[in-house]
Structures are given as structure tokens and as C-alpha cells.
Design a protein with these regions (language model features):
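Extended two-metal-dependent nuclease catalytic cores across DNA- and RNA-processing enzymes
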Residues: 1-77
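Active-site-proximal helix-loop-helix substrate-binding element of RNase H-like nuclease domains
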Residues: 1-15, 124-130, 168-305, 313-323, ...
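C-terminal structured "cap/appendage" subdomains that terminate the fold
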Residues: 59, 86, 649-699
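Conserved "right-hand" nucleotidyltransferase catalytic core of DNA-directed polymerases
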Residues: 60-186, 243, 270-469, 479-486, ...
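Short, conserved charged micro-motifs
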Residues: 189-193, 368, 677-684
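Conserved catalytic alpha/beta cores of large enzymes that bind or transform nucleotide phosphates
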Residues: 203-209, 218-219, 475-500, 511-544
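Conserved catalytic core of nucleic-acid polymerases
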Residues: 321, 325-328, 404-407, 432, ...
Length: 699
């Protein structure tokens, strides 16, 4: 190892762009260094090295000497710290998590934790657990003895995805300290009935971590889950919505200073192995079940202090069941139509590629940034885009801007090629996701978006384009299933602007909504001082960009870029807007000022987002936090509204005994499958519940 720099000087180092001696590999170089006791002596006796490798070495001697000079470590630098200061010390786990959360270094965090000794991960050891495997016929007795009072922690083992699942075992940890493992694959009829009865009992309080997946598996066994009092994943998310990852092991260390293991002295006899049997899966599951109870208490205490406990109990927890119901239902697709659509997009990709090659007069790899850089900026002489480490960027936004400037036909074909590839990939993802029942069962995630918005994955049904004709063709693949009559969609029109009007109490915006006319046209008529019927398409487009951009911290420069107008015109437009809707400006200023003072923003239902960078000395980080502060209350309130609407609609469907069902949530839109003869009743029900989910000053 001490001679690696000398070896690298001979064979080269690609990371430092140092060329090696042609024909000399690591084995040859190592042999030479051993024979001549180092590079310096090897260079001194270069004439003695034989063979073609020796000739190559002599021909590139200057390169070798230069390489060694360049890769030499500086050894006489004055260090601003002493060796003692570099000694390994205790670390602030909370600060590390906050830093990694902010930087979104999720994989690096996992690697860091893996490298740390166990004693560094916790200061208070593991969990005290005394567990047993429940024998045949012993389920009811154990439940009666331990699970009728207090909260019971559950940890389910099995698999669940695509709207279905299967359980293999369940670990229970009772409030009195007892724990048990239930192998559900070998249950007797009596034990099955006893556990199913307790599991469905609303009066038997239960806590879980990420309950939605196991709920699908519970349903698959014909069981029901009642009395879910806490979900530690959701509670942790509400406390720190920017964290992104809510692993149980990480949360127990962060909030309880304990790791997921059995504490020494966990059993009465002081033995660390506090189990009556030796099975890693079941033992680990019981530890997790015990951890869930303690963690739920800690998180709920903190949520109560921060005003988020009601949001957990009344919105996020019950929404878990609603989302699981939607996932299990899925949505039917026309498989033949999807295959035809894939073939169409594939043909369009090939055609766009051929058109691009025809303009150039030769084929290139349209997916290679390096080749595109050479063609666009060297061969075609186009204006340079933004500089990156690997050259001039060729991302979609930059190429679209470049096309707007040049209107070059090659760029037109390149952009279409990329667009058709994206559409083809979307269809491919849908085709791979069709289950045996002919339906697609997406998975909804409540803990991804810091604003509170739901996410869809496997596949993501929220990223299907709807603003283009081709994107709308993809939506046509979703059809009504057998035994149902039609699909029904209902969405919130301009929900973010309605929230803006409500929260700002701006009379102008409230009146614009109350008029029942096109919102953007009405606001444009006020800004430009013309009657609503005199508003042109260009006027409406400018004000529409303003309306939607305000909640994202839109600046005059950003507006000018978006509308392709001069910055001075954009600044004047914003000034005119705020003169007409002054309370909006006051509200936006107040959002940031309040968040800077309190450290967080808040939605209609009290959903908080903490933004410590609002007081950062780094201007870039501070401005990013300010934009987030503007956006979080609006986006978060929109999330609150549609979540409440989903709960209200689901409850009303059950209360009215309707067979129609809610299938999808896509941003501000809900999709329903309508049972025969229920359309009118469903429309009225959905309109009522969505319209009154949260009372606001606007209709």
C-alpha cells in the first residue's frame, strides 16, 4: 500500500486523468518496483529494463515522473487541529439525522450506521421482552390474560403488494410486558376464531408500524382489523415530514435511545435471551412489537405538544384503511388497447429517431449527452446551455429553451423522440403492473411528500400526462370493470387558489370565485382593467401563471422566463396584481414572517412543516426555505381537504349502502367505479362531501 502512488504513476489513474505507460499493467509495474526497490531507483536504471514494456517505459518516462509528482501527497501542511482533536468521540445522532435528512443522503446514512459499532447506536440498550410461542389451543387464554387492557403492539410477518397479501405470523406485545408469537399458518379453528375476534374488536387498542400493508394481508385471511390506535410510521411522519424514511429501528434509537434488540436482564433470571424458544424471526418480531408500544407513547406525547395528535387520529390513521380499500379494488384496464398504444409509441420513437438522423445526415446515439453536446454546440453551433461537470447540459428544460430560441428541426425531432420514449415507458410500466384480475393495483404512500400530498407507486398513476392528446390516450386505457356501469371522476377546480382566497381573506379573489365565471379570466379583467369578455387568451395566460406561481414563491424573473417576456414587464404585472389583490401579498409576507418566528408553517388542519433554514446565514438555503414556507400551507391544506373528502365519501358510501366504490386519488381528483343504477345518487353524494370537506369562505 505504501507504494501505491508509485504503482499509479506507472499504470495511470483514471480518476485523476493520469495516463499510464502503454503495455504496462499492475503486475508488471509491481514486479519492477520490487526489483528496483522503488520508482526513483527504477527511473534511474530505466535503460536496464528489457522487452517491449521496457521500451514503452522509456518512451513515456517523462509522463511517469510527472504522474508521481502530481499524485504525491502534501506532507508538510499545517493542520488547524491537533491529533487529539481528531480522536473519535461520541456523536450527536439527532444532528446527523437532521443533516442527512436535509441533504437527502438516505443511502449514505444507512452505510454510516452499518459502520458504527453497536455501542455507538444507543445509550440505553434494547427492549425488555419475555416472549413465548402460543401453543395450539392457547390463543384465547393468552389474549384474555394479557391483551384486554392497554395498547397491544403488533408486528406482522408475511408479504403484501399490489392490493393483496398473506400473513405467516403475528407478534404481540402486551402492556403488562408479556409477548407472544402466533404462527398463523398452523392455527386450529378455535385459535383462528379467537384471534380473529380479538383482532376485529374496536375496544382492544392496537399499535402498529406501517399498518396499511399488513392490513391487506389481514383481509386476505378473511380477518378484520379494529381498534388501531396508533401507527408509529404516520406519527413520526407528522412530526418530521421532511425526513422521507421512517424505519422502525432508526426511530427507536432517535426517540427512545434504544436499539431493536433484547435488553440485558430482560428475563426474570437476568438472562439476555428472554425467550422460551430459539427462533430469530419470531424473536425479532416480538422485539419490534414491544418497540412499537414504547415508540407510540413517545411520539404521541410529542404530537400532542405540537398539536398534531388530532390530525393523526382523525385523518391519517383512518385514511390508511381507505387507501388499503382502494389498493385492493384496483382499476380495470383494456389490455389489448395498452398493447396497441405501446406499439404506436414505439413506432413514433423510431420515426422521430429517423427524422433526427435525416437532419444530421448520419445516425448518432440520441441518448448520449456527450454525442449530443458535440452535435448541438460544436457541429450545429447552437447557443450554449448551462454548464455542468460533464459539459453543457442537454436536459429537457434546457433543450426546450434552446428550441424556442433556434427552432432547429433537429431539436424538434430530438424532443419528440424523448417525449415518445417517456410515453412508451409509461405504458410499459402499466403493462407490467396488470394483475391476474386484469386490474392495476397501485400502492399509495402517505409519508413521502413533506406537504402531506399522497404519492402513488408501483405503478405511479399520478404521473400520467393529461395535458397532451397522447397523454390523454393513456388515460383511455382505464376502463370500468365487470359488474359496474361506468367510471366517474370528480376533482377540485383551482383548489390551491381557493385556499389562497380563504386564507388571505382577499375580497377580490373571493368575489372571483363567487361569480361562478372562469376564475383566471375574472382575475385578469381586474388586473388589466378590462371587462371579463374583453380578456384575451394572452392576458388570461399571464394571470393564470401568476395565480398558480404565487404559492411557489414566483419571482419577477421566474415569471418573465415562464411567459417569455421582459423582466420589467413581469415586475410591472406582479405589481398590478398585488394592487388589485393586496391581501394576497400581505398573506404571503405573513406566512414567511410567522414561519421564521415560530420555525414552522401550518395548514388548515394544523399540519406542520418545520423549516430551520429560514434563519440560515446561507442565502441560497434561506431562499429555498422561504419558497417552501410559501408553498407548504397551500399544498398542505389542499392535501388536508382531499384527504377529509376521501374519508367523508367513503363513510357516506357505506352509510347509504352503495356498491359504487372509490378507486383512485390523482392529485386533486377522485375516480369512482359506479354500480348500476347508482350514478345520480353517487354524483350528489360526492358533490356534497367534496364540497363540504372543509368549510371555507369560497364555494
Amino acid at each position: 500500500p505504501s507504494r501505491y502512488p508509485e504503482l499509479a504513476a506507472l499504470v495511470g489513474e483514471s480518476s485523476d486523468n493520469l495516463p499510464g505507460v502503454p503495455g504496462v499493467g499492475p503486475k508488471t509495474a509491481a514486479k519492477w518496483l520490487d526489483a528496483y526497490d522503488g520508482l526513483e531507483n527504477l527511473v534511474r536504471h530505466a535503460d536496464e529494463v528489457g522487452g517491449k514494456a521496457g521500451e514503452s517505459f522509456r518512451a513515456h518516462l517523462d509522463d511517469v515522473v510527472r504522474n508521481r509528482r502530481l499524485n504525491a501527497l502534501v506532507g508538510d501542511l499545517e493542520l488547524p487541529v491537533s491529533v487529539e482533536e481528531l480522536t473519535r468521540r461520541d456523536w450527536n445522532r439527532e444532528a446527523v439525522h437532521d443533516l442527512f435528512d436535509g441533504l437527502e443522503f438516505r443511502v449514505l446514512r444507512d452505510r454510516l450506521l452499518e459502520t458504527l459499532p453497536a455501542e455507538d447506536l444507543t445509550s440505553e440498550g434494547g427492549f425488555e421482552v419475555e416472549g413465548e410461542v402460543l401453543p395450539t389451543g392457547g390463543v384465547r387464554a393468552w389474549l384474555d390474560a394479557h391483551a384486554r387492557a392497554g395498547v397491544v403492539g403488533l408486528d406482522c410477518q408475511g408479504r403484501w403488494r399490489a392490493g393483496a397479501g398473506d400473513l405467516t405470523g403475528v407478534a404481540l406485545a402486551a402492556a403488562d410486558g408479556a409477548a407472544a408469537w402466533l404462527d398463523v399458518t398452523t392455527l386450529s379453528p378455535d385459535d383462528d376464531a379467537a384471534f380473529a375476534e380479538w383482532l376485529a374488536d374496536e375496544s382492544a387498542a392496537k399499535a402498529m408500524h406501517d399498518a396499511k400493508g399488513p392490513l391487506l394481508a389481514i383481509w386476505s385471511r378473511g380477518w378484520e382489523l379494529g381498534g388501531l390506535a396508533s401507527d408509529t410510521q404516520l406519527a413520526a411522519y407528522l412530526l418530521r415530514p421532511d425526513q422521507r424514511v421512517y424505519d422502525l429501528a432508526d426511530l427507536t434509537v432517535r426517540h427512545l435511545r434504544r436499539d431493536l434488540s433484547v435488553a440485558a436482564g430482560g428475563a426474570d433470571d437476568g438472562d439476555q435471551a428472554a425467550f422460551s424458544f430459539d427462533d430469530t424471526e419470531s424473536n425479532d418480531a416480538m422485539v419490534r412489537a414491544r418497540a412499537v408500544i414504547d415508540l407510540a407513547t413517545a411520539l404521541e406525547t410529542e404530537l400532542e405538544e405540537r398539536g398534531g395528535a388530532q390530525l393523526l387520529r382523525e385523518v391519517e390513521l383512518p385514511l390508511t384503511r381507505t387507501l388499503a380499500t382502494m389498493e385492493r379494488a384496483g382499476i380495470a384496464v383494456d389490455l389489448d388497447y395498452l398493447h396497441r398504444l405501446h406499439a404506436d409509441f414505439d413506432s413514433a420513437v423510431v420515426a422521430a429517431e429517423a427524422d433526427a438522423f435525416a437532419v444530421l445526415g448520419r445516425p448518432i446515439n440520441l441518448g448520449s449527452p456527450m454525442q449530443l453536446q458535440a452535435v448541438l454546440f460544436d457541429e450545429l453551433g447552437m447557443p450554449k446551455t448551462r454548464r455542468t461537470k460533464t459539459g453543457w447540459t442537454t436536459d429537457a428544460e434546457s433543450l426546450e429553451t434552446l428550441f424556442a430560441k433556434t427552432e432547429h428541426p433537429f431539436l424538434a425531432h430530438l424532443l419528440r423522440h424523448r417525449d415518445q420514449i417517456r410515453l412508451r415507458q409509461t405504458v410499459e410500466g402499466l403493462l407490467k403492473s396488470v394483475a391476474d384480475d386484469g386490474r392495476i393495483h397501485t400502492t399509495y404512500v402517505q409519508t413521502i411528500a413533506a406537504t402531506g400530498r399522497l404519492s402513488s407507486t408501483d405503478p405511479n398513476l399520478q404521473n400520467i400526462p393529461i395535458r397532451t392528446e397522447e397523454g390523454r390516450r393513456i388515460r383511455e386505457a382505464f376502463v370500468v370493470g365487470a359488474a359496474y356501469e361506468t367510471l366517474l371522476t370528480a376533482d377540485y377546480s383551482q383548489i390551491e387558489m381557493r385556499i389562497m382566497a380563504d386564507r388571505s381573506e382577499d375580497d377580490g379573489l373571493i368575489e372571483a370565485f363567487a361569480s361562478g365565471q372562469d376564475f383566471h379570466s375574472i382575475t385578469a379583467s381586474r388586473v388589466f382593467g378590462v371587462p371579463a369578455d374583453a380578456v384575451t387568451g394572452a392576458m388570461r395566460a399571464k394571470i393564470k401563471a401568476m395565480n398558480y406561481g404565487l404559492a411557489y414563491g414566483l419571482s419577477a424573473f421566474g415569471l418573465s422566463q415562464q411567459l417569455k417576456i421582459e423582466r420589467s414587464e413581469a415586475a410591472g404585472l406582479m405589481e398590478e396584481y398585488f394592487e388589485r389583490f393586496g391581501h394576497v401579498r400581505d398573506y404571503l409576507h405573513e406566512i414567511v414572517a410567522t414561519a421564521r418566528r415560530t420555525g414552522y408553517t401550518e395548514t388548515i388542519l394544523g399540519r406542520r412543516r418545520y423549516l430551520p433554514d429560514l434563519t440560515s446565514s446561507n442565502r441560497q438555503r434561506r431562499e429555498m426555505a422561504e419558497r417552501a414556507a410559501l408553498n407548504a400551507p397551500i399544498q398542505g391544506s389542499a392535501a388536508d381537504v382531499i384527504k377529509v373528502a376521501m374519508l367523508d365519501v367513503e363513510a357516506a358510501l357505506a352509510r347509504n349502502g352503495l356498491r359504487s366504490r372509490m378507486l383512485l386519488q390523482v392529485h386533486d381528483e377522485l375516480v369512482f367505479e359506479v354500480a348500476a343504477g347508482e350514478r345520480e345518487q353517487l354524483e350528489a353524494l360526492v358533490r356534497d362531501k367534496m364540497g363540504h370537506a372543509v368549510e371555507m369562505r369560497v364555494p
